[in-house]
UniProtKB/Swiss-Prot annotation:
The lineage of its organism: Bacteria, Pseudomonadati, Pseudomonadota, Alphaproteobacteria, Caulobacterales. It comes from Caulobacter vibrioides (strain ATCC 19089 / CIP 103742 / CB 15). InterPro entries: Aa-tRNA-synt_II (IPR004364), aa-tRNA-synth_II (IPR006195), aa-tRNA-synth_II/BPL/LPL (IPR045864), Asp-tRNA-ligase_1 (IPR004524), Asp-tRNA-ligase_1_N (IPR047089), Asp/Asn-tRNA-synth_IIb (IPR002312), AspRS_core (IPR047090), GAD-like_sf (IPR004115). L-aspartate binds at residues 175, 221, 468, 509. This is Aspartate--tRNA(Asp/Asn) ligase. The keyword ATP-binding applies.
Amino acid sequence: MHAYRTHNCGALRASDTGAAVRLSGWIHRKRDHGGLVFIDLRDHYGLTQLVLHPETPGFNVVERLRAESVIRVDGEVIARDASVVNPNLPTGEIEIRVSAVEVLSEAAELPLPVFGEPDYPEEIRLKHRYLDLRRETLHKNIVLRSRVIQSIRNRMFAQGFNEFQTPILTASSPEGARDFLVPSRLHPEKFYALPQAPQQFKQLLMVSGFDRYFQIAPCFRDEDLRADRSLEFYQLDVEMSFVTQEDVFAAIEPVMHGVFEEFSNGKPVSPINGTHTFTNDFGQSFEHKGFERLTYAQSMAWYGSDKPDLRNPIKMANVSEHFRDGGFGLFAKILGADAKNQVWAIPAPTGGSRAFCDRMNSWAQGEGQPGLGYVFWSEDQGGWGGPIAKNLGEPTQALMESLGLGAGDAAFFVAGDPAVFAKFAGLARTRVGTELKLVDENQFKFCWIVDFPMFEWNEEEKKVDFSHNPFSMPQGGLEALETQDPLTIRAYQYDIVCNGYELCSGAIRNHKPEIMLKAFATAGYGPEVVEEQFGGMLNAFRYGAPPHGGLAPGIDRIVMLLADQVAIREVIAFPLNQQGQDLLMNAPANVLDKQLKELHIRTAPPIKV
């Protein structure tokens, strides 16, 4: 017989009745019933109920053991009486009559209970993560993560991709967040950086003649934390040669759809075999298969966000023309003050009560806004109400019809410069959808966001800067960079969004040195800066570079959505807390003076910036 087990704790069934077995595991729960001790024994695979009689050798020892102690038992599989069969447990038809027990490891008093999974402060959970990971929900999340990654790998290999690894110690480069720096002992006063992403290396692989690359890549970014962001994370890093944007979409959509469908527990996933009509910002339309597509401008105008949750059916609308000629004086004044100002409506189907509208107004004030103007429509005499309706009068009916609303509905309004209020309008849309229970949470709704602006105005530095990835190909190429207002240039950049979360960003790359140098010059970076920061890749492009593109879906966020969690820490085995600390390993920590000396480093008090 094996030293520790003949079966795992999730394996035995009624067909095993009468078998002599050996099991090992943790004491999940212990109950004393009339002299008999019942134990739920747990391992990675499941639970099995044990029965110990007073005459069982070691009975007295087991009686005093705490939960989470580790034991080995020998015994016989017996069928449970029909009245005590547990249909919710795979092993619920049997139990083990224990004939011998040995304590393999006795548990001290627990700082964190495992059975029942009661809520506990995150600080305690992270400090004792090895106990937290024994809890069923978190344990399943980590197993799910493993299976999702395996599924992704299989799907990528099936499409002809090869998996390569890229360096962890590399050079610092300005890619949007702060780098984690690693001092070099062999090269005093010089530093490596941990990669924010394998961006340059994966492009260099394409220049090196490889065609379809991927890896499950570790990435490191020294940035402020939030529920869906971590200092270290993993992404499905992808790059392809000789491709257009359409080719990238066609390659990754089956992977994303397939993985979500495989692990969605029956939740519907946006189909990829249907046909959509996409209209770009210039009014040009064409049909395509796959996920729905929105331009960046459309997403901001309709949803107030570049990562819209399309489970919420509310689509905002520009209703400036209803207010431009007066009626509601405040809005007319705002519209007349600046040509770029607009009035947006946030429809609220079924929200046509004064109580709900007042509640939304109070919420807006809590968000630091002066309020939230509204109109609601009813069957009562007059047909409408609210402060805006009183001033607007009869045009209120036309406004209702233009928004596709009717009696029992409402609409909320924001006015001013959309660049300033769009984010708040998006939050209000989300709030309305949630409050009115319009969001269908039982689905995974995907879309592409395309046609991002190549550049944006950096108000702090008073200059044009890159809005996203500086290595993207501008739409229109060199001609656009030389002839267009930089703020009107769009890039071949795209995001995948699911249920309001950005799952990945990607782009068709700028593979021509002359276009790259011009793009960086437009953002205020001279050729010497580009050569210093990106000289390796720029020089490689001078020796024949294929058109290429790629993207990088975030593994942590994918698993977070599939596990129905709201924080990626719930799908990472050993995460940092929101202050960037590892409470289990006590990191970051002080190091020995000897280590600093070897690295030619002297510490100093923090400098206020």
